[in-house]
């Protein structure tokens, strides 16, 4: 195993490693602390033995378990008010197209399966190197609007995650079949299973059964019951039919309060905003200022995030005002939260070229590509924006597109507006609450 602590983009040109080599970028103490709590080599008995185990149960024996007082509240879904993390476990909080994310204590741990046949381990470090590079080079408070990983482990064997998923899936299948008095089988229909699981997951009786069987059958400190349907969609998607869940990266992040898309009117007001639309203006303005300051840096006018959307913006506590200077103006944020850009997996900047997007983009793009996509996703996430005529009309300037040049909100053609377009946009009265401190 190698260790590299330099946060400069030179990571991109480190010598290639053997297939079995692992490397740690960033803080080794954070990383090793997390790894010490994971069993990457846990194995389970063959599934046929699990099937035979469940033959010892029927509806009557399950009913007796349901009548017990014991319940592990960590097996409720996290959005359920009854959920409580009673153990120091890894709790599944999200699975997207490219990563499986867990929470433990005040950390977020992201596992990313990488296509090792397409990229060397050092070609998959953008999620660590790009934000670290930007943070080290930005000079003002704008650097506070970036989420930097504390550590990243490259080229780790991650087969245990897929094995764990299959074990939990088989347990749920057999448990549901036993509850319904059906013949036990490990064959399943995706549609039928998801319907049965979603119907039961919020039931206190079902959670009591999970409280009994998860420790007995799974015996792991990784709890994947929360949002299990997302993990199901990830592993069962047809595009991953022949996927090798072999190696990938492990990334350690600070724990955020929320992702930006989780804020509704009630929460926006609780956070101190006058309305949901004012909150949306807040995150838009902070992201715009971040991009403008990045584009001021030497050789950074090629910066692309490539996935700028509300769920890739995280909210953190802000204990002091954030002040960002631009020309003769200063933008003052006295809110008790700040927004910060996250998930740089497909990003590029300066000389850090990301092969994951280089091969996908057929034409040249700049900041406008990101904000075109950002505005589309904002309008989709928050239809309330339309109630503010001035703001919604202004945002439409970013999405003057047609089906021929825009596909699923992403530009297919090269539109290279200068960054001055964005600078002028944020000087409007729309953002007067923050310009010069609202004076």
Swiss-Prot record:
<keyword id="KW-0597">Phosphoprotein</keyword>
<dbReference type="InterPro" id="IPR000719">
    <property type="entry name" value="Prot_kinase_dom"/>
</dbReference>
<feature type="domain" description="Protein kinase">
    <location>
        <begin position="87"/>
        <end position="439"/>
    </location>
</feature>
<dbReference type="GO" id="GO:0004674">
    <property type="term" value="F:protein serine/threonine kinase activity"/>
</dbReference>
<comment type="similarity">
    <text>Belongs to the protein kinase superfamily. Ser/Thr protein kinase family. Poxviruses subfamily.</text>
</comment>
<comment type="function">
    <text>Essential serine-protein kinase involved in the early stage of virion morphogenesis.</text>
</comment>
<keyword id="KW-0723">Serine/threonine-protein kinase</keyword>
<dbReference type="InterPro" id="IPR008271">
    <property type="entry name" value="Ser/Thr_kinase_AS"/>
</dbReference>
<dbReference type="GO" id="GO:0106310">
    <property type="term" value="F:protein serine kinase activity"/>
</dbReference>
<dbReference type="GO" id="GO:0044165">
    <property type="term" value="C:host cell endoplasmic reticulum"/>
</dbReference>
<keyword id="KW-1038">Host endoplasmic reticulum</keyword>
<keyword id="KW-0418">Kinase</keyword>
<dbReference type="Pfam" id="PF05445">
    <property type="entry name" value="Pox_ser-thr_kin"/>
</dbReference>
<keyword id="KW-0426">Late protein</keyword>
<dbReference type="GO" id="GO:0005524">
    <property type="term" value="F:ATP binding"/>
</dbReference>
<feature type="binding site">
    <location>
        <begin position="93"/>
        <end position="101"/>
    </location>
    <ligand>
        <name>ATP</name>
    </ligand>
</feature>
<keyword id="KW-0808">Transferase</keyword>
<keyword id="KW-0067">ATP-binding</keyword>
<feature type="binding site">
    <location>
        <position position="117"/>
    </location>
    <ligand>
        <name>ATP</name>
    </ligand>
</feature>
<keyword id="KW-0547">Nucleotide-binding</keyword>
<dbReference type="InterPro" id="IPR008790">
    <property type="entry name" value="Poxvirus_ser/thr_kinase"/>
</dbReference>
<feature type="active site" description="Proton acceptor">
    <location>
        <position position="307"/>
    </location>
</feature>
<protein>
    <recommendedName>
        <fullName>Serine/threonine-protein kinase 2</fullName>
        <ecNumber>2.7.11.1</ecNumber>
    </recommendedName>
</protein>
<dbReference type="GO" id="GO:0044172">
    <property type="term" value="C:host cell endoplasmic reticulum-Golgi intermediate compartment"/>
</dbReference>
């Amino acid at each position: 195993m190698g260790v590299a602590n330099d946060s400069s983009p030179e990571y991109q040109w480190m010598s290639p490693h053997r297939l079995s080599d692992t490397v740690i970028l960033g803080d080794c103490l954070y990383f090793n602390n997390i790894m010490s709590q994971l069993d990457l080599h846990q194995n389970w008995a063959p599934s046929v033995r699990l099937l035979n185990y469940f033959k010892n149960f029927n509806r009557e024996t399950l009913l007796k378990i349901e009548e017990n007082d014991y319940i592990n509240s960590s097996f409720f879904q996290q959005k359920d008010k009854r959920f409580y993390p009673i153990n120091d476990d890894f709790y599944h909080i999200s699975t997207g197209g490219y990563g499986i994310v867990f929470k433990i204590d005040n950390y977020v741990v992201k596992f990313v399966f990488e296509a090792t046949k397409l990229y060397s381990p050092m070609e998959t470090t953008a999620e660590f190197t790009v934000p670290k590079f930007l943070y080290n080079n930005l000079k003002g408070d704008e650097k506070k609007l970036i989420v930097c990983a504390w550590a990243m482990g490259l080229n780790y064997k991650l087969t245990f995650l897929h094995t764990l998923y299959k074990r939990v899936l088989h347990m749920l299948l057999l448990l549901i079949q036993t509850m319904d008095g059906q013949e036990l089988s490990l064959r399943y229909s995706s549609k039928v299973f998801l319907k049965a699981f979603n119907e039961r997951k919020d039931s206190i009786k079902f959670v009591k059964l999970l409280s009994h069987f998860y420790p007995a059958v799974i015996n792991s400190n990784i709890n994947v019951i929360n949002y299990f349907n997302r993990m199901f969609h990830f592993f069962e998607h047809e595009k991953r039919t022949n996927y090798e869940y072999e190696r990938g990266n492990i990334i350690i992040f600070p724990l955020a309060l929320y992702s930006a898309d989780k804020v509704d009117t009630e929460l926006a007001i609780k956070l101190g905003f006058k309305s949901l639309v004012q909150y949306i203006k807040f995150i838009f303005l902070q992201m715009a200022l971040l991009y403008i300051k990045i584009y001021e840096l030497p050789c950074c006018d090629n910066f692309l995030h490539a996935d700028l959307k509300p769920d890739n913006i995280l909210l953190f506590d802000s204990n002091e005002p954030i002040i960002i200077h631009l020309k003769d103006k200063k933008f003052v944020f006295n809110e008790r939260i700040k927004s910060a850009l996250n998930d740089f997996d497909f990003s590029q900047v300066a000389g850090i070229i990301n092969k994951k997007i280089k091969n996908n983009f057929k034409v040249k793009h700049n900041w406008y590509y990101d904000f075109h996509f950002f505005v589309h996703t904002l309008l989709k996430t928050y239809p309330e924006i339309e109630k503010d005529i001035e703001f919604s009309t202004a945002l439409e300037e970013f999405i003057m597109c047609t089906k021929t040049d825009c596909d699923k909100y992403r530009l297919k053609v090269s539109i290279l507006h200068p960054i001055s377009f964005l600078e002028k946009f944020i000087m409007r009265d729309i953002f007067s609450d923050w310009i010069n401190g609202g004076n």
